[in-house]
Amino acid sequence: SLLFNHKPSKDDIAEIFKLMVAAGGSEPGFINGVSARKRAPWFKGANPCVEILLGNKSFCNLTETDVGKFKGDSAGLRRAIYIASRANYRQTCVNLLDGILQEAWHLNNEFLRLCGVGLTGIVRRPDLGGYEYEELKRTATSGAYSMADELGLPRPKNVTTVKPSGTLSKIM
């Protein structure tokens, strides 16, 4: 992936595309660092798929829900996302002070408590559109917040946009 902290010039973009062609057509992700810092002030980088903005010494924390299993059952899908998001928040409660990781990893996890629910099986759900995905995001956020509130712990700084899981979505 390529991180830009300023708008690249046309010459910069042309050079990047030349490199892509020379490499056989591989395609890097493009990250707008200015926009990322507006959305997540802790931003220092991203996961390999670049759908999760990460701080220094932080990591992805995702669960998966197979939306293809819920065709015709919108309430069941929302319930599955809600439960997955609650379980996902519980993962942020793990003590990372294991003598191997630096303390910063543990402290960042406690501070950020990043959560996200990945969607698989989206190819089998062409009926889902923007509104439905926004509703699933709100459901995931609600689940993570409710678990935090029940545990008396801070709410996550971010519950990722509910996102597809790449090629996994096509094979599950």
Each PLM stretch: what is its role?
Residues 1-4, 95-106, 121-164:
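Internal maturation/activation junctions in enzymes
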Residues 10-11, 74-81, 133-138:
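Generic detection of long, well-ordered alpha-helical segments
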Residues 13, 23, 55-58, 115-118, ...:
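Active-site-proximal structural scaffolding
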Residues 16, 83, 130-132:
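A broad, low-specificity signal for short, low-complexity segments enriched in glycine/proline
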Residues 63-68, 154, 163, 169:
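Generic, ordered loop/turn and secondary-structure boundary motif
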